[in-house]
Design a protein with these regions (language model features):
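Phosphate-group recognition and catalysis centered on beta-loop-alpha active-site segments
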Residues: 2, 9, 18-353
């Protein structure tokens, strides 16, 4: 997911984040709870085992029993939605070797970024690229094998595997840099809704959540679709569209207060929150007391999905003593409704199918 921060920053242990969460007044009926177990959401597919955002990663996640797969969506120059964590693809493909002259600098969400960008390539050009593993300490055995998938290919995979397995598999797309793409004439939401509608996925009963770190696009989606929406909330910073409207909060901290959650509930069905906002970890890697965020969100009528659990030693907090399953159990015990993980096999084995 991030803007779900540069993955390598996460090598430094996530620290104290949830200070702004406060108890909410008992005021909202019909709060959701984790009925049986949290849903297992395969973060970028089974990205702990295969290069992220590839059909191989999504298919493996489905085979492992994930309830949802998560494609991050960006646009090509010819308005086709494809799955990449960022529109800058230098770190996840072999683009530098194949198109060295396309390297450039763009301003994305107010900051300069240098690299290769999906919006500078047609789909046909992107088809010539192959995915590579982002993180140096994970296996690179599958580098150079998988192309960049389109949204339609991902949805076709989900429909086909649901039919073959008799299991309802969900899709949890994130619109990346929505305001930026709209500003350059490549909006993400319209082709996403059209692709979902072609599969008959237009209501809350559909196996779909649409997520975003921005606010305005989700608010605009609410009257246009019945599918469930999830507001992403980071531990720090602000939405990229902050300041564009009185309806967009100035910071993520404001959004996770009881009043902020109540406002989110007017347009969204869930919040996707950085895990430290639910169960903080101190600078020594020790667990602190859980925050009130899960209870606050449930009072507002919102489901709570946390991100991102990773089994790698570089990411797993010391508090779990190398036991990745213990982290899944800890969040399940706190009543969260869904968990994003790079290793969905660990989540399914720990929580059950």
């Amino acid at each position: 997911m991030l803007h779900r921060r540069n993955d390598l920053i996460a090598l430094v242990v996530l620290a104290t984040a949830g200070a702004c969460v406060t108890p909410a007044p008992a005021r909202t009926p019909a709060a959701p709870t984790a009925a049986v177990r949290p849903i297992v959401i395969a973060h970028r597919g089974a990205s702990g085992h295969r290069p992220e955002h590839t059909l191989a990663a999504y298919a493996l996640a489905i085979d492992m029993g994930a309830d949802f797969i998560e494609p991050d969506l960006v646009s090509t120059r010819d308005s086709v939605l494809v799955a990449r964590h960022e529109n800058e693809i230098g770190g996840t493909t072999d683009v530098a070797a194949k198109y060295p002259d396309r390297r450039t600098t763009r301003t994305i969400d107010g900051r300069p970024v240098t690299g290769w960008f999906t919006e500078d390539f047609t789909l046909a050009e992107l088809r010539t690229l192959r995915a590579t593993e982002r993180l140096p300490f994970r296996s690179h055995a599958h580098d150079g094998r998988e192309p960049i998938p389109t949204l339609d290919e991902i949805l076709d995979l989900v429909v086909r595997r649901s039919r073959e397995t008799g299991r309802r598999i969900g899709v949890y797309p994130e619109t990346k840099h929505s305001s930026y793409f709209r500003s350059i004439g490549l909006p993400l939401e319209e082709p996403l809704l059209a692709a979902l509608a072609r599969r008959g996925w237009t209501t809350a009963a559909a196996p779909v959540f649409i997520q975003s770190f921005e606010v305005g696009n989700l608010r605009a989606l609410r009257p246009r679709t019945g599918v469930r929406l999830a507001q992403l909330i980071a531990a720090e910073g602000r939405p990229a569209d902050a300041g564009t409207s009185a309806d967009v909060p100035a910071t993520y901290a404001e959004m996770r207060t009881p009043a902020g959650l109540a406002r989110i509930a007017r347009y969204a069905n869930a919040v996707g929150v950085e895990k430290s906002l639910v169960l903080p970890i101190d600078s020594a890697g020790r667990r602190r007391a859980p925050t009130s965020l899960v209870a606050d969100a449930h009072r507002a009528g919102l489901a709570v999905h946390v991100w991102t659990l990773r089994s790698d030693a570089a990411f797993l907090p010391k508090a779990y003593a190398g036991d990745a399953a213990a982290e899944w159990r800890a969040f399940a015990a706190l009543g969260v409704d869904g968990i994003f993980g790079d290793f969905p096999d660990v989540g399914v084995a720990t929580l059950g199918r």
